[in-house]
């Protein structure tokens, strides 16, 4: 069984955050989500047991 993760770059109150959402067979696993202020830290945490499938920069959509 392969776990996939999407990393979302978002802006909350003028602070950039990277949020990883983990999925198995298209169902999100809420207790496996992770948030950090850097992409590298988020990716390092997620790559322990997941494949990163998508990166979505939500800050570009806000502008």
Task: Annotate the PLM regions.
Residues 14-32:
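A short, structured beta-strand/loop element
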Residues 4, 59-63:
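Short acidic DE-rich linear segments
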């Amino acid at each position: 069984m392969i776990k996939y993760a999407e990393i979302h770059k978002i802006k909350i109150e003028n602070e950039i955050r990277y949020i990883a959402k983990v999925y198995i067979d298209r169902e999100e696993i809420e207790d496996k989500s992770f948030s950090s202020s850097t992409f590298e830290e988020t990716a390092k945490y997620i790559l322990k047991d997941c494949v990163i499938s998508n990166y979505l920069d939500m800050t570009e959509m806000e502008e």
